[in-house]
Amino acid sequence: MADNSTHPIMKILESFGLTDVILAFFLSMVVGLLLGALVYMILTWMSRRRASATITRIPVHQSRSTTRSSSPRSRLGYSRHSSGYDRRSNNSLASAAFSFHRQTSSSPIDYGDSTGRKSSFRASTFHPLLQCSQIAREAEEGAQGSLPRTPTLTTSPGAAGSTSTVSSMITPPRARNRPDSFWGNSNLRGFHAGQTPPPAYDSIIRAYQETTT
């Protein structure tokens, strides 16, 4: 005998109809999509609102209080930096003005030779070593000019030997000529020309051979 029993789910589906089931499925899908889109829009709006709230400006009274509390330090730092910059600029301007005044006020023969010729190298730039040597030369000339003069002794002709000895004792010693330094007044002269030259190489070899033998 054939089994005429059917499944209960099939009975339920047969009672609703196939077209009604398909329509209900699509309607539920559309409603779910609409609800999901609505929830997504609400969440994005809330997140943007929270982000914009963190970026918004501080109220006026709070900003004033914060600027008052932080202004002394910032102003102090700014004043320090500005004062340092002004000091540097003033120093550079003063040095430039001083050098320009020094170059324009110098006469053309201040650093010239003894004959009065103009030396372009000395008159163009500032040379403290040359000034020091010039000051020392002037001091030496002043010291020589301030020495007492030799008194003239009037004696008889018979005492010629005594007068010569007395005059030799009284006359001041001659001013020694200063050797030219390595750094000359106008150029590099090197060592003094009057220095003894080194011994010859042959004489050194001969002396060494004599000492060894």
From Swiss-Prot:
Transmembrane segments: none annotated. A motif (Bipartite nuclear localization signal) lies at residues 48-68. Keywords: Nucleus. Residues 63-75, 146-168 have a biased composition (Low complexity). Its main location: nucleus. Disulfide bonds: none annotated. InterPro entries: Myc_target_1 (IPR029180). Residues 59-89, 139-201 are annotated as: Disordered. One of its GO terms (cellular component) is nucleoplasm. One of its GO terms (biological process) is embryonic hemopoiesis. It is found in: Nucleus. It comes from the Eukaryota. PANTHER family: MYC TARGET PROTEIN 1. Belongs to the MYCT1 family. This is Myc target protein 1 homolog. It comes from Danio rerio (Zebrafish). The lineage of its organism: Eukaryota, Metazoa, Chordata, Craniata, Vertebrata. The gene is myct1.
